Amino acid sequence: MIVCAEMDEHWGYVGAKSRQRWLFYAYDRIRRTVVAHVFGERTLATLERLLSLLSAFEVVVWMTDGWPLYESRLKGKLHVISKRYTQRIERHNLNLRQHLARLGRKSLSFSKSVELHDKVIGHYLNIKHYQ
């Protein structure tokens, strides 16, 4: 059971900034760890994939930013929309940018293939959160 889960999306790119790649993930506010993540476009389909991974957990309270798809998809659940209550996951986004140069906004380091981009970030999350 997860008492409080923060959900957010993190922007990245592959090859050129026009080829966007989004990391959607959920962060357990109490345990301070990433619970699940998926890569894809910033669409409802990617959000649905993340929520299907999270269906195994019983999440009591969802905390998200103001992206409208969160509100429409989490209707009927205890859902808090606030920047104040997503500060931990936003801090984690900053940590990702600091630890992985390819996620920096203005960097000479960038991913050249989608497969490698997903594997490097997935491996980092696996080492830091899933083990």
Curated annotation (Swiss-Prot):
- Give GO MF terms, alphabetically: DNA binding; transposase activity
Q: Which keywords describe this protein according to UniProt?
A: DNA recombination, Transposable element, Transposition
Q: Name one Pfam family in it.
A: DDE_Tnp_IS1
Q: Does the keyword Hydrolase apply?
A: no
Q: Does the keyword Membrane apply?
A: no
- Record's InterPro entries? Transposase_27 (IPR005063), Transposase_27_IS1 (IPR051354)
Which is a GO BP term held by this UniProt record? DNA transposition
Per the similarity annotation, which family is this?
Belongs to the transposase 27 family.
What's this protein's function?
Absolutely required for transposition of IS1.
**Which protein are we looking at?**
Insertion element IS1 protein InsB
Name of encoding gene: insB1
